[in-house]
């Protein structure tokens, strides 16, 4: 029989052999790397190491290092659950609703063993709908819409010829409607030449015939009596010019001459003076950070901070000294039966048992996940007929129906293509010149243009500064539990030994039940930025870029050569609306259009009814590992595991307690003598020995040495037990005990100290997109960033929304039916139709043969959201997105005041992050930076102010004679001349195109006189002939009696107003006419443009203050963007008013030889030529002039023009006006009056008066034209155009400033604002955040704010400087300087009209000044502070809102006086 020691030795040897064998196997495995991972096979199925499965519902197996270990499932008792059910595929019954009687819930039994894995739960409900997806690409354009409804009926009117089928009193009273117009017939052949024209006017008498030949000389007769005086001889040749006479008296003032032709282009002027200093360039790039300033003076002691977070547990203290043993307690009651002891060591391997009987079939497992769809089944039998199918293709066109009633005349058709060129007709007689038409009224504003094309995606902007550090991350997953410790052998408790060396890592214990969630780890340091990702997919097309600025007007090009006659011009502007024509004939059917492009695939249809369950598919391969689940709750303790193999030697344990007294061993062999001991105590007295024999008495000797030691006596009886000895020294460390059974799981340890940051890990795959975080609190509004570089011109944007329909135009004349147009271009695909309702599922029909691919159906409506699918495989990492555009810079917080330097304290525990401090004040501006590179030249400055008028120049020479005036009115018909002979009938020539007039030929010879014809009817009016040569002098007629003066004729109907002539040169100023009567009020103008942006809404409640993030590193400055493409050429600006005349320049160098002079005046008419042959019939003339105007409506009335006094001035031009001066004299006066009135109007335009009817552009213009006028209120119209939107302003005539008043100059003085948190002082905008507050508007009472906004925009453009002041009335409210602190932290903020903030301190360009400061402390009395702001950036004024800071208490009141904004 083995002793206990031998048994232990044997077990140790066995464990060593097993370990060695395992290591050898491991080495062999390590050498053969191709051996697959450890798996197990059961029932033909292969499982991986550590896999757990249930071959039967009540049996559970695990693959452990290639062996299958199985165990029965032990079910918990189901108490208080009468209706417990065993789910399919499960072993243990469960309560159906999970409810137990409430009375039993309080009795808690002993915690049972760990239950099995529960069955897979039913599929959860569909999640809530996701957020809206990224907007899709714009859809293809829809098809053209259906034709609109017919427009309103056209105008009726005085177009009698077209409406001659109208009302007929003699008929039955109805209106006879003509039938539809037939189709146009084919073009006819050219007609024969027309009949000869009517008889021409009587020709002038022929020249006297040549004298006949002289007869023979007769004899001389007697002298006759003196004859009568002969007729006057013909005028002799003109004599030589006489000498120059003395100058005559000054003639009456002539009419202004017509404008001479424009002179040649002058020489290039000298360079102008340097322009005004340009605007400041944009702010330079941010300078390098300055060196840190010196420490400031110590601040006041801050308030006591909040208590910090609880610190981390400290390191364990040193072990205390061992306490004294306590007194022995009384014996306790007997304890409960202890748990079963640990399993024994593994027994020897038993013989293999016989196969057990087949187990019973397990209960049915739970329904599996729905399988993949099976392969398609064979075609079923033919089902019954399905529901009616969808509509078929449209049928063939039906026969024409009977013609309907003629519809209302249609709108004019689109203009057809030009027909073939017809043969030229014979030339018609020349028509009269039409009267000039009236100037058209100003057209309505055109409809808003289509939005521009979408811009091309701009290049990525420069990298923004690194953003603020993100919010604290979610807690990381809990780390894996450490390996279980080995169990030490029991011993008596020794003093703690020195720490042993850490032993090697033990094999992994069985998986423990999940522990409680560990504490939140502290965030690690930020990893290095990841490598740049692949480029992302192309983004959506960007929004359209704004149009670039207008380019400067280019120089005029040289004149081109005359071009060939151009093709026919495009259709002219739309004419006046005509009467509706008859309906045109129906056009021929157009060719079928091309097939449309294949439509886009429709969206998924509605979810159909669920199909039948498919057969179970084959087991799919294991899916990829899912993301780690959240940590489960702590499970119940599991049942004890199988006995493990002995572990390796553990580290030396602590010294055990002293063992009990052992049995005494056998006596050992005697050792060698020890060194001599110290003298012992005297032994007890020995027993008296027997007496020795008597020796002889010796002499007394010296005392001898001690004798040898006697033999030991017999052992005495054992003594009684002695008192316990002192505690011995600790024994040597015992050998390691065998590993104990697995201990219970320890409690979660305290949170460890933060580890040092790990090295950067390998770049991981891109994780799945997380759920969207909550919206952050709105940040403070940043200051406007500098304008970015202009992006390249964008591609054409999608067409904008259709504008609202304009008002229906007047109906046009009916156009002739156009010819059939070409087939239209292929239409764009139409909008997707709405999806129809899902029909009920029909019975399954037989599988038909595959039909041809049908047209793509219209996309259906978006289907309902499907239930969430199973997680897909992990995708490849998505490409990294492009760097986003830089965010707007936040407001720079002013640095806080530096605190006093404290003594170096010990490092305190980490406190919670405190709330962000208030922004400090802005520091003083730094020293000026180095000079920047020279900037590119600025845009041309505004034109300088015109110089003062120069001295009066020398009078110019008299202008050349003007071009001949317009053709005179038609004269009265002359008396019939003496009858001439009719000419011969000329042959009718072929009708040629009319050639250009040839040069005038020399006068022809006189023809023989013709016979007298009969008196012809007066012919049609010919064009007036040249003046005839003077006829032969007739006999003197007898003087007729003077006729009575004729009665004045009735005034003729006024002709239509002629077009505005080109403006003539400025006439000399006429005498001022009397003021005309006030004109009628004009019609209301069209609706103005959209009003200005409304007031901002009230500020929302203040959000919680976010935690201040770490400051990011400054990003490198991005490269400059590419230059923008040049903008389209802008429209020419309106011509400015003429400046005053400059001083005469110095005499220039002599010019080149001048061009030939103008042609001289027309010479006297030559002798009359002989009558020419009759010309061919002319082509038909152009349409005659319009008939006389209808009854007067709102006609053009010249009565508003001031009538000059009707002096009878000498009329120098009378000889050229007409043959009968008396008839025309009244007309001349009217023309002269109109001319004078026009010149007066032109004078008003060039030198406006500032009245409502004649507003100036700015007060500066008024001051320049009328320097002696006084300051006061005048009307100005900076945007020119119609004067109905002129505004009333105050003109300061000393300075030329234009001052616009606010519509409400004063704001009541009262308490406007009560703060919910009076200690939280911040600026509150009066118009934006205060109840009943408003933003300031300008323009005076009754003006339209939209008009004023436009006029102010123009006024800013024409000004270089603006200023305004505001008076703040206060009671207990600081406006600027705080008397208590001496600083400006409580000063008001102003908001300019470009929404920039104007402050009391900081950058000097954005600071205001104060002229009176009476609001520096809380005195309880009213005071005032006057604020003034002057700037060259005119877009910042006027001020539209004010934000005080020192308000909000019930006793704090304020009000404003808003001054005018003045532009210069």
Swiss-Prot record:
Q: What residue range is the signal peptide?
A: 1-22
Q: What is the effect of changing residue 593 to S?
A: In OI2 and OI3; moderate to lethal form
The site annotation (Cleavage) covers 161-162, 953-954, 1218-1219
| Annotated region (Triple-helical region), positions in chain | 179-1192
Kindly list the positions annotated as binding Ca(2+): 1277, 1279-1280, 1282, 1285
Keywords from UniProt, A to Z, are: Calcium, Chromosomal rearrangement, Collagen, Disease variant, Disulfide bond, Dwarfism, Ehlers-Danlos syndrome, Extracellular matrix, Glycoprotein, Hydroxylation, Metal-binding, Osteogenesis imperfecta, Osteoporosis, Phosphoprotein, Pyrrolidone carboxylic acid, Repeat, Secreted, Signal
Result when mutating residue 383 to C:
In OI4, OI2 and OI3
Task: List the residue ranges of the region (Nonhelical region (N-terminal)).
Answer: 162-178
Question: What happens after mutating residue 839 to S?
Answer: In OI2; mild to moderate form
Q: What is the effect of changing residue 275 to D?
A: In OI2; results in slow procollagen cleavage by N-proteinase
Q: Give me the stretches of Gly residues compositional bias.
A: 485-494
What InterPro entries does UniProt report for this protein, alphabetically?
Answer: Collagen (IPR008160), Collagen_superfamily (IPR050149), Fib_collagen_C (IPR000885), VWF_dom (IPR001007)
Q: What is the effect of changing residue 1022 to S?
A: In OI3; severe form
Modified positions (5-hydroxylysine) are 265, 430, 505, 751, 862, 1033, 1096, 1108
**Positions of the region Disordered?**
98-1214
Q: Which spans of this chain does the record mark as coiled coil?
A: none
Outcome recorded upon mutating residue 224 to C: In OI1; mild phenotype
Give residue numbers for the modification (3-hydroxyproline).
Answer: 885, 1164, 1179, 1182, 1185
Instruction: Describe what happens upon changing residue 866 to S.
Output: In OI3 and OI2
Q: Which PROSITE patterns match?
A: NC1_FIB, VWFC_1, VWFC_2
Annotated positions of the Pyrrolidone carboxylic acid modification: 162
The UniProt subunit note reads as follows: Trimers of one alpha 2(I) and two alpha 1(I) chains. Interacts with MRC2. Interacts with TRAM2. Interacts with MFAP4 in a Ca (2+)-dependent manner.
Q: Which disease is it linked to?
A: Caffey disease: An autosomal dominant disorder characterized by an infantile episode of massive subperiosteal new bone formation that typically involves the diaphyses of the long bones, mandible, and clavicles. The involved bones may also appear inflamed, with painful swelling and systemic fever often accompanying the illness. The bone changes usually begin before 5 months of age and resolve before 2 years of age.
> Family per UniProt?
Belongs to the fibrillar collagen family.
Name under which the protein is recorded: Collagen alpha-1(I) chain
């Amino acid at each position: 029989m083995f002793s206990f020691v031998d048994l232990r030795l044997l077990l140790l040897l066995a464990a060593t052999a097993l370990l060695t064998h395992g290591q050898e196997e491991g080495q062999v495995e390590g050498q053969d790397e191709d051996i697959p991972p450890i798996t197990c096979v059961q029932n033909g199925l292969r499982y991986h190491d550590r896999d757990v499965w249930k071959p039967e519902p009540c049996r559970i197996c695990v693959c452990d290092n290639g062996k299958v270990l199985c165990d029965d499932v032990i079910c918990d008792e189901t108490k208080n659950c009468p209706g417990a059910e065993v789910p399919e595929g499960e072993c243990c019954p469960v309560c159906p609703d999970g409810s137990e009687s409430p009375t039993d819930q309080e009795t808690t039994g002993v915690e049972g063993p760990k239950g099995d894995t529960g069955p897979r739960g039913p599929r959860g409900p569909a999640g809530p709908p996701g957020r809206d997806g990224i907007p899709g690409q714009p859809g293809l354009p829809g098809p053209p819409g259906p034709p609109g409804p017919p427009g309103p009926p056209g105008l009726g009117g005085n177009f009698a010829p077209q409406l001659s089928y109208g009302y007929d009193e003699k008929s039955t009273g109805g209106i006879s409607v003509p039938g539809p117009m037939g189709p146009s017939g084919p073009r006819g052949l050219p007609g024969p030449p027309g009949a000869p024209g009517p008889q021409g006017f009587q020709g002038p008498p022929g020249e006297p015939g040549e004298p006949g030949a002289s007869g023979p000389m007769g004899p001389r007769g007697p002298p006759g009596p003196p004859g009568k005086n002969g007729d006057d001889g013909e005028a002799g040749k003109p004599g030589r010019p006489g000498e120059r006479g003395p100058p005559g008296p000054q003639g009456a003032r002539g009419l202004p001459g017509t404008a001479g032709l424009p002179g040649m282009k002058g020489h290039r002027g000298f360079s102008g003076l340097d322009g005004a200093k340009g605007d400041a360039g944009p702010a330079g790039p941010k300078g390098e950070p300055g060196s840190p300033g010196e420490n400031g003076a110590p601040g006041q002691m801050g308030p006591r901070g909040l208590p910090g977070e609880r610190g981390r547990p400290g390191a364990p203290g040193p072990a205390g000294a061992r306490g004294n043993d306590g007194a022995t307690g009384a014996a306790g009651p007997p304890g409960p039966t202890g748990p079963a002891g640990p399993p024994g060591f593994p027994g020897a391997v038993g013989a293999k048992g016989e196969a057990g009987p087949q187990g019973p079939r397990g209960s049915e497992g739970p329904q599996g996940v729905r399988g993949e769809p099976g392969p398609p089944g064979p075609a079923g039998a033919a089902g019954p007929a399905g529901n009616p199918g969808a509509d078929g293709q449209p049928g063939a066109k039906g026969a024409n129906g009977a013609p309907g009633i003629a519809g209302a005349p249609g709108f004019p058709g689109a203009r057809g293509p030009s027909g073939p060129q017809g043969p030229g007709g014979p030339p018609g007689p020349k028509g009269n010149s039409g009267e000039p038409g009236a100037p058209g009224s100003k057209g309505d504003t055109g409809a808003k243009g289509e939005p521009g094309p979408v811009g091309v995606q701009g290049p990525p902007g420069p990298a923004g500064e690194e953003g603020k550090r993100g919010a604290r991350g979610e807690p990381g997953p809990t780390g894996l539990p450490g390996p279980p410790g080995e169990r030490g052998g029991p011993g008596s408790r020794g003093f703690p030994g020195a720490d042993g060396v850490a032993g090697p890592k033990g094999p992994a214990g069985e998986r423990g039940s999940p522990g409680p969630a560990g504490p939140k780890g502290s965030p690690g340091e930020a990893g290095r930025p990841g490598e740049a990702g692949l480029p992302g997919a192309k983004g959506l097309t960007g929004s359209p870029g704004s149009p670039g600025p207008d380019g400067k007007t280019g120089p005029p090009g040289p004149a081109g050569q005359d071009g060939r006659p151009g093709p026919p011009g495009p259709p002219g502007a739309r004419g006046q609306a005509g009467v509706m024509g008859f309906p045109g004939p129906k056009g021929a059917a157009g060719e079928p259009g091309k097939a449309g492009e294949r439509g886009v695939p429709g969206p998924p249809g509605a979810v159909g009814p669920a199909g039948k369950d498919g057969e179970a598919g084959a087991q799919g391969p294991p899916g990829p590992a899912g993301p780690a689940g959240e940590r489960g709750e702590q499970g119940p303790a599991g049942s004890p595991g199988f006995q493990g193999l002995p572990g390796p030697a553990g580290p030396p344990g602590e010294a055990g307690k002293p063992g009990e007294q052992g049995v005494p061993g056998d006596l050992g062999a005697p050792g060698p003598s020890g060194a001599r001991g110290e003298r012992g105590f005297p032994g007890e007295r020995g027993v008296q020995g027997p007496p020795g024999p008597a020796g002889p008495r010796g002499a007394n000797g010296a005392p001898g040495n001690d004798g040898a030691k006697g033999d030991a006596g017999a052992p005495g009886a054992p003594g009684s037990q002695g008192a316990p000895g002192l505690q011995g020294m600790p024994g040597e460390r015992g050998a390691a005990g065998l590993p104990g059974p697995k201990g219970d799981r320890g409690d979660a340890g305290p949170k460890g100290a933060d580890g040092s940051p790990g090295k950067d890990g390998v770049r991981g795959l891109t994780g799945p997109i997380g759920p969207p975080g909550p919206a952050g609190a709105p940040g403070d509004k940043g200051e406007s960033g500098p304008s970015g570089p202009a992006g390249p011109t964008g591609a054409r944007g999608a067409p904008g929304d259709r504008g609202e329909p304009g008002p229906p135009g007047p109906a046009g004349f009916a156009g002739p039916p156009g010819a059939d147009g070409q087939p239209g271009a292929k239409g764009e695909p139409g909008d997707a139709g709405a999806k129809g309702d899902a029909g009920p599922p029909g019975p399954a029909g037989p599988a038909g043969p595959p039909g041809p691919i049908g047209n793509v159906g219209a996309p259906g409506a978006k289907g309902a959201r499907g239930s969430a699918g199973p997680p897909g495989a992990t995708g490849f990492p998505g490409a990294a997105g492009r760097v986003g555009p830089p965010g707007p810079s936040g407001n720079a917080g002013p640095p806080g005041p530096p605190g006093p330097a404290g003594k170096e304290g010990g490092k305190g525990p980490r406190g919670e992050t405190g709330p962000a401090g208030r922004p400090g004040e802005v520091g003083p501006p730094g020293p000026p930076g180095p000079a920047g590179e020279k900037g590119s030249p600025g845009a041309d400055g505004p034109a300088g102010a015109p110089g003062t008028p120069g001295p009066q120049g020398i009078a110019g020479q008299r202008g050349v004679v003007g071009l001949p005036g317009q053709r005179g009115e038609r004269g009265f018909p002359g008396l019939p001349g003496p009858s001439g002979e009719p000419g011969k009938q000329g042959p009718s020539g072929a009708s040629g195109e009319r050639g250009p007039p040839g040069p005038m030929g020399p006068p022809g010879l006189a023809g023989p006189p013709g016979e007298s014809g009969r008196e012809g009817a007066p012919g049609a009016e010919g064009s007036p002939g040249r003046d005839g040569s003077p006829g032969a002098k007739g006999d003197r007629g007898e003087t007729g009696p003077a006729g009575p003066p004729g009665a004045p004729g009735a005034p003729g109907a006024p002709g239509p107003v002629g077009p505005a002539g080109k403006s003539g040169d400025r006439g000399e100023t006429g005498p001022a006419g009397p003021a005309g009567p006030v004109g009628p009020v004009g019609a209301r103008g069209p609706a103005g443009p959209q009003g200005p942006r409304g007031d901002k809404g009230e500020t929302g409640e203040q959000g919680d203050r976010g935690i201040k993030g770490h400051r990011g590193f400054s990003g490198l400055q991005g490269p400059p963007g590419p230059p923008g493409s040049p903008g389209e050429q802008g429209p020419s600006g309106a011509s400015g008013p003429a400046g005053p005349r400059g001083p005469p320049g110095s005499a220039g160098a002599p010019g080149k030889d001048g061009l030939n002079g103008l042609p001289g005046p027309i010479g006297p008419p030559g002798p009359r030529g002989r009558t020419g042959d009759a010309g061919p019939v002319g082509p038909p003339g152009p349409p005659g002039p319009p008939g006389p105007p209808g009854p007067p409506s709102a006609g053009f009335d010249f009565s508003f023009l001031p009538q000059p006094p009707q002096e009878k001035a000498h009329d120098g031009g009378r000889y050229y006006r007409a043959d009968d001066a008396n008839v025309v004299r009244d007309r001349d006066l009217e023309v002269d009056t109109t001319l004078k009135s026009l010149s007066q109007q032109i004078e008003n335009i060039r030198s406006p008066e500032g009245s409502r009817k004649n507003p100036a552009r700015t007060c500066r213009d008024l001051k320049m034209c009328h320097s002696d006028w006084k300051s006061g209120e005048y009307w100005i119209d900076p945007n020119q155009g119609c004067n109905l939107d002129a505004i009333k302003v105050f003109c300061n005539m000393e300075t030329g400033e234009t001052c616009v008043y606010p519509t409400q100059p004063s704001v009541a003085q009262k308490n406007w604002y009560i703060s919910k948190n009076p200690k939280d002082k911040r600026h509150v905008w009066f118009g934006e955040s205060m109840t009943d507050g408003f933003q300031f508007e300008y323009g005076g009472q009754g003006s339209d704010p939209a008009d004023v906004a436009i006029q102010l925009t123009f006024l800013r453009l024409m000004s270089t400087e603006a200023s305004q002041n505001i008076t703040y009335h206060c009671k207990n409210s600081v406006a600027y300087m705080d008397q208590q602190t001496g600083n400006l932290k409580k000063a008001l903020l102003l908001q300019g009209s470009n929404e920039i903030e104007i402050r009391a301190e900081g950058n000097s360009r954005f600071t205001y000044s104060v002229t009176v400061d009476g609001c520096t402390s809380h005195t309880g009395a009213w005071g005032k502070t006057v604020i003034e702001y002057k700037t060259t950036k005119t877009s910042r004024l006027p001020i539209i809102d004010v934000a005080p800071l020192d308000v909000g208490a019930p006793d704090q009141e304020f009000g404003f006086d808003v001054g005018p904004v003045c532009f210069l």
